[in-house]
């Protein structure tokens, strides 16, 4: 009977092996080397800047090198008028450039969004300046502003201005001249992003608005503009950060001159470190710029709903 009971006992279920954690960890292991490398490229310069901002470090005067505490920051905020001048000009440059680029970019996007013959070619020509580097843009506009062979001579031929006028050497004209040069390259950025958003607006909305008797202006104000709001806000903040860091175009176009009229804070930092070899003070100025850009980045991430929040 015991034997029969033993035979009737159901077999034990097969033991399952624990799933290996390796497949789940494999993606993280694969990206770990690249992530650590990128972290090193980002973290090391940031830490070095913070460290040297507390030092007096000038390779040409090694006997003066040493710990300076907050002296560099105190000097910047209380004793260096150039710091405040460049900071104010940076704000002016960002405000004017981003504002004009947004307005012209919006108008350009609305134009190329229409149906017309040769639209594809027109879009390619309109967007092509965005692919040009800042240095090459400066080279183009330096030639255009040349007092002997540029547009100033042709304007003088028709009675506008005088011969021999150099817009990049005159304190009264250098700012608008630099603004126009950067507009040529920056406007397509807004036009591309806004055009991409324009093409996602349903045509049914415009047809319904026309049936209701809404004018083109009302359609733009109540349909187009609300739809573009998020794209405009985020692209404006992103472009503001880029314009604040615009060194290549201004450096090659004006060099910060004349008389420091077009020197932004990043350009002042470059001159302080490269020309004056005052790396300690330049690091302190870089820290200030880092805090400003960090604040702008936090605003950008907050408005873009960073972290998976629903729009």
Cite the ranges covered by each PLM segment.
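Short, Lys/Arg-rich, polar N-terminal cytosolic tail immediately upstream
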Residues: 1-22
């Amino acid at each position: 009977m015991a034997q029969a009971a033993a035979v009737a006992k159901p077999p034990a279920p097969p033991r399952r092996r624990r799933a290996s954690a390796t497949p789940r960890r494999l993606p993280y292991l694969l990206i770990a080397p690249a992530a650590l490398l990128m972290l090193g490229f980002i973290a090391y310069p940031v830490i070095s800047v913070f460290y040297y901002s507390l030092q007096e470090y000038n390779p040409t005067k090694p006997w003066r090198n040493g710990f300076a505490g907050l002296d560099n920051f105190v000097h910047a905020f209380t004793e260096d008028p150039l710091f405040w001048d460049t900071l104010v000009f940076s704000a002016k440059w960002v405000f004017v450039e981003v504002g004009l680029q947004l307005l012209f970019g919006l108008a350009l996007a609305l134009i190329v969004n229409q149906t017309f013959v040769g639209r594809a070619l027109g879009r390619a020509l309109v967007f092509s300046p965005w692919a040009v580097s800042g240095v090459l843009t400066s080279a183009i506009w330096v030639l255009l502003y040349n007092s002997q062979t540029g547009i100033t001579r042709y304007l003088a031929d028709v009675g506008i201005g005088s011969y021999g006028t150099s817009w990049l050497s005159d304190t009264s004209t250098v700012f608008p001249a630099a603004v126009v040069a950067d507009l040529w390259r920056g406007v397509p950025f807004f036009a591309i992003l806004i055009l991409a958003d324009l093409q996602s607006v349903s045509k049914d909305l415009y047809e319904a608005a026309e049936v209701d008797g809404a004018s083109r202006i009302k359609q733009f104000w109540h349909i187009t503009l609300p739809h573009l709001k998020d794209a405009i806000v985020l692209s404006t903040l992103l472009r503001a950060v880029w314009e604040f860091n615009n060194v290549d175009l201004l450096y090659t176009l004006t060099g910060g001159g004349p008389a420091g009229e077009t020197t932004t804070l990043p350009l002042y930092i470059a001159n302080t470190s490269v020309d004056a070899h005052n790396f300690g003070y330049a690091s302190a100025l870089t820290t200030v710029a880092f805090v400003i850009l960090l604040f702008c980045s936090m605003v950008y991430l907050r408005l873009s709903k960073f972290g998976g929040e629903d729009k």
